[in-house]
A protein has these predicted regions:
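N-terminal secretory signal peptides that target proteins for export/translocation
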Residues: 1-14
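Bacterial N-terminal signal peptides
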Residues: 16-29
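Sec/Tat signal peptide C-region and signal peptidase I cleavage site
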Residues: 32-36
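Short, glycine-/small- and polar/acidic-enriched structural segments
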Residues: 37-173, 179-183, 199-205, 220-222, ...
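Sec-exported extracytoplasmic/periplasmic mature domains
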Residues: 60, 87, 106, 169-173, ...
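Short, hydrophobic alpha-helical packing/hinge segments within bilobed ligand-binding/sensory domains
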Residues: 81-83, 100-101, 188-192, 208, ...
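Periplasmic-binding protein-like
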Residues: 119-128, 212-239, 251-254, 258, ...
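Secondary-structure end/capping motifs
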Residues: 242-329
Length: 347
C-alpha cells in the first residue's frame, strides 16, 4: 500500500517539474532576441564612415538584438539620399550628417530628429580641408586660402558645404567667392582632388586617408579645429515614429553603444589618434569591418560622439538659420519643429 500511495505523488512531482521547465522555456522564448520571427525589424541608412561607429558596434555586438530588434544596415555614398530614403519608406532610421535636404524634408513634417551623433570637435579629426598637389604648390597652404578656389563637396547644402560656409564666416571672405562644385558623392570628390580637376575638397578623414598616404593630396586642416559644430544626427520618418516601442528600443541600443565607444575609444584618443591595445582593439576592429579600412587607419578617424546621445540643439538652430539665409533651406520653420522632443536629449 505504501508503494501504491507514493506513485501518484511521484508522478505529480514529475508533472510539476515538467510544467516548470516548460514555463521557463516559454519565458526564454518570449525574451528579446530569442526568436527571429518575434524581433521588430527595421532598416537603418548609414555611410561607411567612422562617424557611424556606434551603429556598427550595436549591430556587431548584438545590442540591437538584445533590445528585440532585427536591424538591416543599408549603406549610401552621400548623406542627403539617406533622408530621402527615410521619407520614401526605404529605410526606417537614418544616422548621418545634417544637410539642407534633411532639413527641408523635416520642415515639411516627413522626418524628425530623435538624437545626436557625430560632432566636429577640436582634437577629434572628422572632416578635413584637402588641397590638390598642384594647388598646394601654387600657394594653397591653409584653410583660409580657399577663397577664390574650386572646391569639391558632395552636394549643395551638405555638411561639407556648410563647413565651408562657416570657414568663410570665420575668415571674412564671401562663400560666393568660392567656386563650389557639388560632385554628388565622396568617391567622386576624392577622384576629382586626385585628378587635379579641383583645387580642394572637403572630405571625411576616412575617405581622404588613403589619398594622403599615397601622396595624392595635402591636408590643410580640420573642421573641428576651425569651426566646431553638431555634424550628425539620428532621425526617423513620422511613420516610424508612430511605432514607439521600435524607436525606444533602437535608441536604447544606440546609446549603449555611444557610451562604450566614448569610454573605450574616445577616452583614449591623444593627438587625434586612438591607441591599439587590448581594450580598444575589439571596437576598432568592428569599425574597420564596416568602413572597409584597416585598423591602423581607423585609429585616426575617431569622430567625437556624446556618450548619452545628446544633441546640441542650439547649434541645430544656428544651422537652420544659416542655411535659410543662404537659400538652401525653406523658410518658415525653426529647430523645434523638426525635433521629436519625446526622444531628443538636448545638450
Amino acid at each position: 500500500m505504501v508503494q501504491h500511495d507514493r506513485a501518484p505523488k511521484v508522478w505529480a512531482g514529475c508533472a510539476r517539474g515538467a510544467f516548470a521547465g516548460l514555463l521557463a522555456l516559454a519565458v526564454v522564448a518570449a525574451s528579446p532576441g530569442a526568436r527571429s520571427d518575434e524581433l521588430l525589424k527595421a532598416k537603418v541608412g548609414v555611410l561607411r564612415l567612422s562617424s557611424s561607429a556606434p551603429v556598427f558596434i550595436a549591430q556587431d555586438k548584438g545590442y540591437f538584438r538584445d533590445e528585440g530588434l532585427d536591424i538591416e544596415l543599408k549603406f549610401f555614398d552621400a548623406a542627403q539620399p539617406i533622408a530621402v530614403a527615410a521619407t520614401s519608406g526605404d529605410i526606417d532610421f537614418g544616422v548621418t550628417a545634417f544637410t539642407a535636404g534633411l532639413y527641408n524634408l523635416a520642415g515639411k513634417g516627413t522626418l524628425k530628429v530623435i538624437g545626436g551623433m557625430s560632432r566636429e570637435k577640436a582634437g577629434y579629426p572628422l572632416i578635413g580641408y584637402f588641397a590638390s598637389n598642384n594647388a598646394y604648390a601654387a600657394g594653397l597652404k591653409t584653410p583660409r586660402d580657399l577663397a577664390g578656389k574650386r572646391v569639391a563637396v558632395t552636394q549643395i547644402g551638405s555638411s561639407f558645404h556648410y563647413s565651408l560656409g562657416l570657414l568663410a564666416d570665420k575668415y571674412g571672405f564671401k562663400l560666393s567667392d568660392v567656386k563650389v562644385l557639388p560632385l554628388q558623392s565622396l568617391s567622386n570628390a576624392a577622384a576629382a582632388l586626385k585628378g587635379e580637376t579641383v583645387d580642394a575638397a572637403l572630405l571625411p578623414v576616412s575617405t581622404a586617408r588613403a589619398l594622403i598616404d599615397a601622396g595624392g593630396a595635402k591636408l590643410l586642416g580640420w573642421v573641428g579645429d576651425e569651426t566646431p559644430w553638431q555634424l550628425g544626427a539620428v532621425f526617423a520618418s513620422t511613420r516610424t515614429l508612430a511605432d514607439k516601442p521600435l524607436v525606444t528600443r533602437f535608441l536604447a541600443a544606440l546609446v549603449r553603444a555611444d557610451r562604450e565607444y566614448h569610454d573605450v575609444i574616445l577616452a583614449a584618443v591623444t593627438d587625434g589618434k586612438a591607441p591599439i591595445n587590448e581594450n580598444t582593439r575589439p571596437l576598432l576592429e568592428i569599425i574597420a569591418k564596416y568602413t572597409n579600412l584597416p585598423v591602423e587607419q581607423v585609429v585616426g578617424n575617431c569622430a567625437y560622439i556624446d556618450p548619452g546621445g545628446k544633441l546640441d540643439v542650439s547649434n541645430v538652430a544656428n544651422q537652420i538659420g544659416w542655411l535659410q539665409g543662404q537659400g538652401f533651406v525653406d523658410k518658415g520653420f525653426a529647430a523645434d519643429a523638426i525635433l521629436a522632443r519625446d526622444y531628443v536629449k538636448p545638450d
